[in-house]
């Protein structure tokens, strides 16, 4: 049974024994929620801040006892109409019913598929692709959304059309028929679909062992204490949003959330909720992608006529999901340090869906670590620290240290051999938080999830992992430096020009810093074959390139969204500044700089720049014509 200490005492985690996570047989989140329903039944479990009708929001609360009852009712209904192994898709708006839907699927012993209301803008194609891939027998939604969901699936044949259940219409009395599911540690709990931008999304199989393991890893990294509470606006269909909101089910205290749109429209809502300290609660924790820190710093600072703000109780905000910018963190600290925000509060982190979510983060007593390395050495797969003002200096943000009972090694993927600290290779992972494969994709699963590390170095980062352990290939470049993990970039996004490697985020950063005419965080760098460049490039004397139908050499393209108020500016000086900065900083010629309007660059469902989708739209001409349909991150209220 899970135990917490007295109020104010350190969070005691009985599942960590001798540095490894150990669970009793058949431990799962269902058992945790049922325990809290018994020992904290009259206490707040979840609060949804609903800003759809009131500017200041309406708090919609559910207690642990009621949460358990609703979960059992939905779980029982699913047990009545589905079979073990069936997929249950969640097409709910982000509210309490979404959480009840997800837990209801876990309570039923079926496989949850956290998705989103089809009314959300920008996601229709992805939603159809995921439903085709997982073939759910049932869809959970709400009474208000049910009609839209039925219209959305109407085009499917009757045989392929899932049953639609409105969870808020399921009587609580049905809970009396619920039976504890016969799920074990290896049973798949849910499918976490990746945020791929060009290929069909893959559903990572997360088991009933993977899920609590990763939740415990996050809580341990955050040094949770009795009374700590969570705050989030992240979408539940994204791995970071889902795992963050599930922390409450193990910690046993309350969690407050809002919709992504509520944050995007008024980021001060998130900041003020982080500062709120009701009753005897302890510290506050949260998570957000990098852009949120910049957005909050610009638009979330309280006005003079608003109540005072005290952020001294904010313990940790995981910063992940996209590359972490030192400038964004600096702006966030400068904006909120006057309100008591600790320098240790923001935690640059690393994670991915294949690991359930969490891999590493900055230790709680440390400020974010930013070092500078030589660009040429970096492009040659080596980490060599230099002074910040050195000519070739590139800032690198530490992703901290790997979580408890988890292993991350840097590998030469060609030889499956571990590399020493300071050398860049592919990050391979092992641990009980790693998913078991991709749903219905045996070959792809084997390539990603079933790799053997053929050789280890002395003082190996794999120490403690079995010799025959299976390792997950992340597709990310990284290295260890001074005992911290650093992420260099995605292998598939690497730009190779004239035989030299260039990390796209490095090129994007240089372009961003060369001009104020680009939206912060909305720049994409990629390469295309010379003979596939559009004719307009060859007509431009600045490109310095003549068309040759046999020239397949890779050429650099930069696409950037114009910042607000810059649409009337002459584009040529902006383009010239970008070209010059990259030529000087990287020694490479930019053959095309395309400036587009806000909202044009494709983004993945987790908000990252979709470089491959952007490249595809560039090649087919839709990006230049402005008729592309990028994925939109924010969801509606």
From Swiss-Prot:
The alphabetical list of record keywords is: ATP-binding, Fatty acid metabolism, Ligase, Lipid metabolism, Nucleotide-binding
Q: Which gene encodes it?
A: fadD32
Q: What is its EC number?
A: 6.2.1.20
Q: Kindly state a single biological-process term from the GO annotations of this entry.
A: fatty acid biosynthetic process
* Protein's recorded name: Long-chain-fatty-acid--AMP ligase FadD32
Q: What is the lineage of its organism?
A: Bacteria, Bacillati, Actinomycetota, Actinomycetes, Mycobacteriales
| Record flagged with keyword Ligase | yes
Name the CDD domains for this protein: FAAL
Q: Which PANTHER family match?
A: DISCO-INTERACTING PROTEIN 2, DISCO-INTERACTING PROTEIN 2 DIP2 -RELATED
């Amino acid at each position: 049974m899970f135990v917490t200490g007295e109020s104010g005492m350190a969070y005691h985690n009985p599942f960590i024994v001798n540095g490894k996570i150990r669970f009793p047989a058949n431990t799962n989140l269902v058992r945790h929620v049922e325990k809290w329903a018994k020992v904290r039944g009259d206490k707040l479990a979840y609060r949804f801040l609903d800003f759809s009708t009131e500017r200041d929001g309406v708090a919609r609360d559910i207690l642990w006892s009621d949460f358990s009852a609703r979960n059992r009712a939905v779980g029982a209904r699913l047990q009545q109409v589905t079979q073990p192994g069936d997929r249950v898709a969640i097409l709910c708006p982000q509210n309490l019913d979404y959480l009840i839907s997800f837990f209801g699927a876990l309570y039923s012993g079926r496989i949850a598929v956290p998705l989103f209301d089809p009314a959300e803008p920008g996601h229709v194609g992805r939603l159809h692709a995921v439903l085709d891939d997982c073939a759910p027998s049932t869809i959970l939604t709400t009474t208000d959304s049910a009609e839209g969901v039925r219209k959305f699936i109407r085009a499917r044949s009757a045989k392929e059309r899932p049953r639609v259940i409105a969870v808020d219409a399921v009587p609580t009395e049905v809970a009396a028929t619920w039976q504890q599911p016969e799920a074990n540690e290896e049973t798949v709990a849910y499918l976490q679909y990746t945020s791929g931008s060009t290929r069909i999304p893959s559903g990572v199989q997360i088991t009933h062992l993977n899920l609590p393991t990763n939740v415990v890893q996050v809580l341990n990294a955050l040094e949770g204490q009795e009374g700590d509470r969570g705050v989030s606006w992240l979408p539940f269909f994204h791995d970071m949003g889902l795992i963050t909101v599930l922390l409450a089910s193990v910690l046993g205290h309350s969690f407050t959330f809002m919709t992504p749109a509520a944050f995007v429209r008024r980021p001060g809502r998130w900041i003020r909720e982080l500062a709120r300290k009701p009753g005897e609660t302890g510290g506050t924790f949260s998570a957000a992608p990098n852009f949120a820190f910049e957005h909050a710093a610009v638009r979330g600072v309280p006005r003079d006529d608003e109540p005072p703000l005290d952020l001294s109780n904010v313990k940790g905000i995981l910063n992940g999901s996209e590359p972490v910018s030192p400038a964004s963190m600096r702006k966030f600290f400068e904006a909120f340090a006057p309100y008591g925000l600790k320098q240790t509060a923001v935690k640059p982190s690393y994670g991915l869906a294949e690991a359930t979510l969490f891999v590493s983060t900055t230790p709680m007593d440390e400020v974010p670590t930013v070092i500078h390395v030589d660009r040429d050495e970096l492009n040659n797969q080596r980490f060599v620290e230099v002074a910040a003002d050195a000519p070739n200096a590139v800032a690198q943000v530490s992703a901290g240290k790997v979580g408890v009972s988890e292993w991350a090694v840097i590998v030469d993927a060609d030889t499956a051999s571990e590399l020493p600290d300071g050398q860049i290779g592919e990050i391979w992972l092992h641990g009980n938080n790693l998913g078991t494969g991709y749903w219905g994709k045996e070959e792809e699963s084997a390539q990603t999830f079933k790799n053997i590390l053929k050789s280890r170095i002395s003082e190996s980062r794999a120490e403690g992992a079995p010799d025959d352990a299976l390792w997950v290939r992340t597709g990310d470049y990284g290295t260890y430096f001074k005992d911290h993990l650093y992420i260099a970039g995605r292998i598939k996004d690497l730009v190779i020009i004239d035989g030299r490697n260039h990390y796209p985020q490095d090129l994007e950063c240089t372009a961003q810093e060369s001009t104020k005419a680009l939206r912060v965080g909305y720049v994409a760098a990629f390469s295309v074959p010379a003979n596939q460049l559009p004719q307009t490039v060859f007509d431009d004397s600045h490109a310095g390139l003549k068309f040759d139908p046999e020239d397949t050499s890779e050429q650099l393209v930069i696409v950037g969204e114009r910042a607000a108020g810059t649409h009337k500016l002459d584009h040529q000086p902006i383009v010239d500044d970008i070209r010059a900065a990259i030529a000087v900083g990287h020694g490479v010629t930019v053959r095309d700089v395309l400036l587009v309007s806000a909202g044009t660059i494709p983004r993945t469902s987790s908000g990252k720049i979709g470089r491959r989708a952007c490249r595809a739209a560039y090649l087919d001409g839709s990006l230049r014509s402005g008729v592309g349909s990028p994925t939109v991150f924010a969801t509606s209220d």
